[in-house]
């Protein structure tokens, strides 16, 4: 057996996510808004940059050399202007503050006189600060408390919280207790939203009485003590009891507690406050929230009077499958806007087969008109100019070559005068300033590095920020992925994906293939951007090892028409499109070796990886599943019921890897974190038990202290995955190489959170 050279692993390690910012300087701009959004600063490499869009100015936030010299004098430490010992600043007028060398400092930018100072009162990680930064709320003993930041005075806003019926908590799996402890915090921030004037708090009382309990054992607690039992509340599909959210408004001055006079909201997945399914009106005069039943086949908009608790239902839409306020469930706010002081509603719907905007009269629920239309989809509402009656948004499907690329558009609320503000054919990833005056635009494709600018609502570039430099990335042997189009297994539907050629590619060679799926339905596996996203970075590394790496968004994933996204309803994780894509690609690429195909996935992708091996054993010879959802009937109710269907209506055996384990023919590595609160370890244990009973060979790696993201263990996971693929697809012995553990720095954590 040949030995793979260690340089392959060294090259692959350089392409892991935590190295990305150093390899692609200028690839990402993370604005930190100041002056209400009128200006912002960001880090460009090791430099701090200040941007004033109204003035069209991009300048250094301060003189780095003078500040470094002043800090060195004041602290007695060596300070390099090209590597300042802080990653964040606070700017106010002509001063800048920062923390360094165990102290807090203020520098006057007129004189560069530096002095020690007390840090400004700020909210801790476990708190949620008011808009005016005067107060912060936090949880204590099942209740919600408030702290005055100026002097630290604390008082309780509720007093009747109890275990299983407490305030401002999300479902247990979302609390990420293991991960949060690793990061040094006691808990997640409360599920709470402040009124615009900072006087009241919208939250919910969380009712988890009678919810199913699940258990995990922490083998090695942080204190080194004996194994510890962890019990969490975790409802399964079809359970009678699921977590419920009882909306409540709290007045921090008077202590008034106003409870919504409506049924509590099913909350199996995440808090409606955290997902912005419940929010304050801009003037604080009302709370609006969305609700839907557990099966998700209707969606309603309600108005809550924060003074009385009275609830009025404004709109309800029903459908044959799930009705959604957007197709992307991870991080994006619902596409619902209240206009005209609450008299009109801008509403997202897929009723005509595509995701579009509709205008309603709030008082009567009457449809005033369809705002957008056509065989394309609205991706995000960016801004509504109520004076000019115009809505700005991103749309996907207007670029013929790639229906996933986003275009910035505007249209009148009467449905007329559609215009594209970005007239090119690249993707536009947009972030709107808090004051709504402009937007930061990152324009790229999967093969074209990002150009980041600030634009006004006429589409004009106000300030150029960054041109991503890929010189260092190219030096690693990286080549841009190929964006491809193939047919789905039905032979009709177009699918899109990316293909990474192996490093040192020779078209006369034959290369093993690694499929890297994620089926959604709440997120895409492939991004249309140059940055491949958190699910895509390891694909670049595996190409460095010598694999052809493929990723494709099959039917059932978001971003296209309603029929496309509904294709997986009742059949989650089906891999027929993955298999069809690989076979089509290989027909015109003889260097792809279909006799050596592997598949690697995590979470829902882990389920699909195993399902691919079970349903297509003639194609997939090796697979790796990390924290796979192998038994959907044991996943949290909110996800399974919404995307697969209710038990009794949907066939859960159809999507069970455990039920079809007898089909396994290839080499399989199962990985799971022993403390995973999201996809509980029993998913992998059940599959392993079934395979062992069937006398099937299977490798298994359980990392006792790991949660769903495996933070702190990634270096080991990467090596073990790579070793497995090298052995079983290359028929080679992997080198003796240990990957350096990842550091939880701000850039790395921002990629996840």
Positions of predicted regions on the chain:
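Beta-propeller folds
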Residues: 1-432, 437-448, 454-455, 733-735, ...
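Serine-hydrolase catalytic core recognition
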Residues: 262, 277, 284, 290, ...
């Amino acid at each position: 057996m040949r030995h793979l050279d260690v340089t392959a692993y060294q090259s692959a390690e350089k392409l892991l996510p935590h190295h990305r910012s150093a390899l692609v300087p200028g690839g990402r701009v993370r604005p930190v808004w100041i002056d209400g959004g009128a200006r912002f600063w960001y880090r460009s490499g090791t430099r701090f940059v200040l941007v004033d869009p109204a003035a069209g100015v991009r300048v250094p936030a301060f003189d780095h050399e003078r500040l470094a010299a002043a800090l060195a004098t004041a602290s007695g430490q060596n300070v390099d202007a090209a590597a300042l010992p802080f990653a964040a600043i606070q700017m106010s007028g002509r001063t800048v503050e920062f923390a360094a060398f165990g102290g807090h400092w203020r520098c006057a930018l007129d004189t560069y006189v530096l002095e020690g100072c007390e840090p400004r009162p700020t909210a801790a990680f476990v708190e949620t600060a008011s808009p005016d930064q005067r107060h912060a709320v936090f949880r204590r003993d099942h209740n919600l408390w408030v702290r005055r930041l100026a002097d630290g005075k604390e008082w309780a806003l509720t007093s009747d919280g109890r275990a299983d019926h407490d305030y401002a908590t999300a479902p247990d799996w979302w609390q990420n207790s293991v991960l949060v402890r690793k990061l040094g915090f006691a808990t997640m921030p409360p599920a709470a939203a402040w009124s615009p004037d900072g006087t009241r708090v919208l939250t919910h009382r969380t009712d988890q009485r009678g919810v199913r309990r699940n258990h995990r054992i922490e083998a090695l607690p942080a204190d080194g003590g004996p194994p510890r039992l962890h019990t969490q509340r975790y409802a399964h599909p079809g359970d009678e009891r699921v977590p419920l959210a009882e909306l409540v408004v709290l007045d921090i001055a008077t202590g008034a507690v106003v409870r919504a006079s409506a049924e509590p909201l099913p909350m199996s997945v995440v808090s409606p406050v955290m997902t912005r399914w419940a929010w304050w009106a801009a003037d604080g005069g009302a709370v609006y929230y969305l609700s839907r039943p557990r099966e998700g086949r209707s969606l309603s908009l309600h108005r809550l009077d924060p003074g009385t608790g009275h609830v009025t239902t404004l709109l309800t839409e029903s459908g044959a499958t799930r009705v959604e306020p957007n197709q992307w469930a991870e991080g994006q706010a619902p596409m619902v806007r209240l206009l005209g002081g609450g008299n009109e509603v801008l509403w997202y719907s897929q009723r005509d087969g595509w995701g579009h905007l509709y205008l309603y009269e709030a008082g009567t629920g009457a449809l005033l008109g369809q705002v957008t239309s056509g065989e394309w989809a609205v991706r995000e509402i960016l801004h509504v100019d109520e004076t000019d009656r115009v809505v700005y948004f991103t749309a996907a499907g207007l670029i013929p070559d790639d229906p996933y690329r986003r275009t910035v558009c505007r249209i009148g609320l009467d449905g007329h005068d559609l215009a594209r503000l970005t007239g090119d054919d690249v993707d536009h990833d947009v972030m709107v300033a808090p004051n709504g005056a402009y937007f930061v635009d990152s324009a790229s494709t999967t093969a074209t590095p990002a150009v980041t600018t600030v634009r006004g609502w006429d589409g004009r570039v106000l300030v150029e920020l960054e041109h991503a430099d890929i010189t260092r990335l190219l030096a690693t042997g990286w080549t841009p992925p190929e964006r491809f189009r193939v047919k789905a297994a039905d032979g009709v539907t177009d699918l899109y994906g990316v293909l990474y050629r192996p490093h040192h590619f020779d078209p006369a060679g034959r290369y093993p293939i690694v499929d890297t799926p994620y089926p959604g339905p709440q997120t895409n596996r492939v991004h249309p951007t140059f940055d491949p996203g958190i699910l895509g970075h390891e694909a670049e590394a595996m190409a460095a090892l010598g694999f052809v790496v493929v990723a494709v968004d099959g039917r059932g994933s978001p971003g296209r028409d309603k029929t496309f996204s509904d294709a997986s309803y009742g059949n989650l994780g089906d891999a027929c499109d993955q298999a069809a894509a690989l076979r089509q690609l290989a027909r015109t690429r003889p260097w792809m070796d279909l006799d050596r195909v592997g598949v690697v996935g995590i979470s829902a992708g882990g389920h699909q990886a195993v399902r691919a091996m079970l349903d297509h054993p003639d194609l997939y010879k090796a697979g790796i599943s990390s924290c796979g959802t192998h038994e959907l009937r044991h996943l949290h109710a909110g996800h399974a019921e919404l995307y697969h269907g209710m038990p009794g209506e949907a066939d859960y055996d159809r999507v069970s890897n455990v039920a079809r384990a007898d089909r396994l023919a290839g080499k399989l590595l199962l990985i799971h974190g022993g403390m995973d609160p999201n996809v509980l370890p029993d998913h992998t244990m059940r599959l392993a038990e079934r395979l062992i009973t069937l006398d099937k060979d299977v490798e298994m790696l359980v990392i006792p202290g790991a949660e769903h993201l495996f933070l702190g263990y990634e270096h080991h996971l990467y090596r073990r995955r790579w070793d497995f693929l090298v052995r079983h697809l290359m028929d080679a012995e992997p080198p003796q190489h240990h990957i350096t553990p990842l550091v939880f720095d701000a850039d790395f954590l921002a990629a996840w959170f």
